[in-house]
């Protein structure tokens, strides 16, 4: 996979989400137990968005889109308790 992101958005994301940068968040795609879902709420006629929940030191929630054969990171943050529960319950390995 080839990743890209907007550098200004990445800096904003770090400030907003406890230092979680996109260069760190891309590691979520290495998690074989990750959960990926289509984001119906935020997708548009011109852009499909996806959510992925996976483990990178802690459970992360990452939003991305596919653009020109690249995975473009839109946002990344620590998963909420509900999202973490979904991740752990899906594989029952707590």
Predicted features by range, described:
Residues 1-94:
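Ribonuclease/tRNase effector modules and their secretory precursors
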